[in-house]
Amino acid sequence: MGRAEWRKSMSRASCLCGDVTWDLEGPYVFMHHCHCGRCRKAHGTPFATYIGAAEDGFRLHGAARVTAWAPQPGVSRSFCSRCGSIVPGATFGGLVFAPAGNFDDDPGERPADHIFVASKAPWYAIADSLPRFDAYPPGVDAVVLPDPPRSPARTGVTRGSCLCGAVAFEIDGPPLLARNCHCGRCRKARSAAHASNMAVPADHLRFTSGGDDLITYKVPEADRFAQTFCRVCGSSMPCVYRARGIAVVPMGALDDPPGVTPACHIFVASRAPWFTIADDLPQHDEYPPDA
């Protein structure tokens, strides 16, 4: 294969801070939206989109920044220790599965189905016509891990936690708003098609455990964009902006139904080329007029 062909067949991806990058060579397989509780926790989003390729066509750069959390032998999730973006980790059957939200270009592949819809977030509705499977689709022989256990809900309190359980938080009262954001920073930070964020008054959120396990990365050139994550497992966690009096909560981190659903899509001008918005929520190229 000539150098020009090699470039054409490769897709480049990177984490939010840029310290970890990777090249993934096609052909690609099994691009899917996963709704399992573990993906939701890890990414902080309603679902995670992954794409598979042969491991010998995968090249990772910046491995020194990568942290892997392994809840049990043979199962791990990897993330950038500086910014918290999810990055490709362990291989499966000669394949590496990469989060699609980190692509710098269009891989040319499109999601084929939704998996683990039996674990779907109660605040998210699947609006497209792709096939849906309660767990893995037929023909995929892989271990099915149970969703993280949950204790009974408490009236008036919305709880959340990271995937490993080191960090937990509670929110008193209703949120201010909830939106789906498609900006490039949110896609890189969450390693997903979009972020689903909920804003709450800063003094209504409290961390009940793991406050010392939180890392916050602020994009240097951004006025206010930052990502907070668990240093142990990399899960996206609420980011508190004290000067603005708000906390931005990744809805995938919630353990209880928040009593609200995202009201609109913002920054759709930056939408991932491989993702189609199929619902009827209002769409805004950038911030909504009332922001």
Spans of features found by a protein language model:
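A short Gly-Trp-Pro
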Residues: G2-S161, A166-A291
